């Protein structure tokens, strides 16, 4: 059994991570740290865990050394400070953006690898430290990986994507609370969202270079969870050729599905799936992708990375069912 520690245990991604791991046959959760709620029963904060964990299980104030793997479910910019006090013998999967870009892969004696399984599955188990991708970055990259792999991305890419309120985490912000987001939609970080750095890095890795530009408009949605992304770019191939490229690329990826029908968020909420819909209009390839931002965009993908890291079945603990209605 792999012994697990979690830091940032009171947040939304930690909640989903705990729910996945308590049903994972290969792991044991040893410590869940929350600096905000030390000594408080975990089910007091994560009320959906009542009956799922022992009622006397408390948040800890610090991590213990008797673990094999540490999940860092904390905000951006804090991971390095925490890792200074963590033994190098403990493997790490980090949810923040601190180690996602090449220039940040090295920290002290740790070397991080970018944990997008559909991109780096063959090398993830060679690393002890994984930078979990951003949620928008995941939805967007899964839309274009097959094209970048054979160097087909040559033109500008235009993206619009909308995310649920849980994407911002448990923070006190007037633009993120219920009264603002309910029955509402708003843009933010137009053409300047930091997840695009991950996308550009991946395109350059696969194609060596990319001369086009990426125009990304992110939206805050009036719902709690999920991401739906639609992008388009010019591709000078037939639609049949494009579909064959996607089918071939994703044939061994258990969480990626292509749908000829229109797709919607309820198909993926509570799952580690990404569903893609392709359309081709006047040399423009239009790709819609849907994921659960808390699972495939965060905690589920982290467990998928863990499974690959430890040579478990990739889907272990992740055979989750969508909410549906």
UniProtKB/Swiss-Prot annotation:
EC number(s) reported in the record: 1.2.1.38
Enzyme class: oxidoreductase
Protein's cellular compartments: Cytoplasm
SMART domains: Semialdhyde_dh
Lipid biosynthesis found in the keyword field: no
Gene3D superfamilies: Dihydrodipicolinate Reductase, domain 2, NAD(P)-binding Rossmann-like Domain
Xref: CDD domains: AGPR_1_C
Record-linked PROSITE patterns: ARGC
Keywords carried by this UniProt record: Amino-acid biosynthesis, Arginine biosynthesis, Cytoplasm, NADP, Oxidoreductase
Keyword Nucleotide-binding: no
Pathway noted in the entry: Amino-acid biosynthesis; L-arginine biosynthesis; N(2)-acetyl-L-ornithine from L-glutamate: step 3/4
Molecular-function annotations in GO: N-acetyl-gamma-glutamyl-phosphate reductase activity; NAD binding; NADP+ binding
Residue numbers annotated as active site: 135
BP term (GO), one: L-arginine biosynthetic process
Catalytic activity as recorded in UniProt: N-acetyl-L-glutamate 5-semialdehyde + phosphate + NADP(+) = N-acetyl-L-glutamyl 5-phosphate + NADPH + H(+)
UniProt cross-references to InterPro entries, sorted A to Z: AGPR_AS, AGPR_type-1, NAD(P)-bd_dom_sf, NAGSA_dehydrogenase, Semialdehyde_DH_NAD-bd
Single GO cellular component term: cytoplasm
Record-linked HAMAP family: ArgC_type1
Family designation: Belongs to the NAGSA dehydrogenase family. Type 1 subfamily.
Function text: Catalyzes the NADPH-dependent reduction of N-acetyl-5-glutamyl phosphate to yield N-acetyl-L-glutamate 5-semialdehyde.
NCBIfam families: argC (TIGR01850)
Protein name: N-acetyl-gamma-glutamyl-phosphate reductase
Species, as recorded: Karelsulcia muelleri (strain GWSS) (Sulcia muelleri)
Organismal lineage: Bacteria, Pseudomonadati, Bacteroidota, Flavobacteriia, Flavobacteriales
Gene: argC
